[in-house]
């Protein structure tokens, strides 16, 4: 979208009574094509606040194979600075590339721990949002369980999408019980509405 297209949507959300928004369009230092400080002002002009955002940078084949994600962390440093300027409290990774091995998943857990440490240093919380495929197995381990057990709770939280958890044949309540305190945020949607 071009700069400013989101303003009527923001006003409509505020008119419905929403007080926070979660953005999902970070690219090249901009949110919805707008400098982060301006996006923050536009949101706050409606009486709302930018609480969180979805953004990610997947690891390349080389980074995944070598475990060296130094270049990716440079991108994250810029991303974190932009989100701090936008007043964001939570940065959430909405998905990751398909992983076929536990070694690859372990690399992603180390990557997320490092990004989480950088977010924490900036006063931002860092998390991961599931879909149904995180309930698939990689080498006989459920991906989400492995991620929960191999990320640092002090650096990485999880934003459970309840719909996708159920679609993955799992119970949200079972996960809340098994991993207390790991699910800081939820996404709730109605299956009847989205099919």
Predicted regions mapped to residue ranges:
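Histidine-acidic metal/acid-base catalytic patches
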Residues: 1-17, 87, 141-160, 164-195
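Mature catalytic domains of secreted/periplasmic carbohydrate-active enzymes
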Residues: 21-22, 33, 40-42, 47-48, ...
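A short acidic, helix-capping loop that chelates divalent metal ions and anchors anionic groups
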Residues: 1, 58-66, 99-102, 168, ...
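N-terminal pre-domain/capping segments
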Residues: 1-89, 120
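Hydrophobic faces of well-ordered beta-strands that scaffold small-molecule active sites
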Residues: 1, 21-23, 50-55, 91-93, ...
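Active-site acidic/histidine proton-transfer and metal-coordination neighborhood
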Residues: 20, 61-158
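Generic recognition of short, well-ordered alpha-helical segments
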Residues: 4-8, 34-38, 74, 103-110, ...
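Active-site-proximal loop/turn and secondary-structure-junction residues that shape catalytic pockets
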Residues: 25-27, 56-59, 95-99, 130-134, ...
């Amino acid at each position: 979208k071009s700069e400013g297209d989101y303003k009527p949507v923001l006003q409509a959300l505020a008119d419905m009574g929403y007080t926070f928004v979660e953005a999902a369009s970070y690219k090249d230092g901009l949110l919805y094509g707008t400098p982060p400080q301006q996006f923050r002002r536009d949101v706050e002009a409606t009486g709302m606040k930018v609480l969180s955002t979805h953004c990610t940078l997947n690891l390349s084949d080389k980074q995944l194979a070598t475990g060296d994600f130094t270049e990716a962390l440079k991108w994250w440093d810029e991303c974190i600075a932009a989100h701090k300027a936008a007043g964001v409290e939570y940065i959430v990774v909405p998905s990751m590339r398909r992983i076929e091995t536990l070694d690859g998943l372990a690399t992603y857990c180390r990557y997320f721990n490092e990004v989480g440490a950088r977010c924490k240093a900036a006063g931002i919380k860092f998390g991961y949002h599931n879909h149904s495929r995180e309930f698939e197995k990689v080498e006989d381990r459920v991906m989400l369980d492995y991620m929960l057990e191999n990320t640092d709770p002090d650096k990485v939280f999880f934003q459970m999408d309840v719909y996708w958890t159920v679609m993955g044949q799992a119970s949200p309540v079972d996960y809340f019980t098994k991993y207390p305190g790991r699910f800081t945020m939820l996404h709730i949607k109605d299956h009847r509405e989205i099919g």
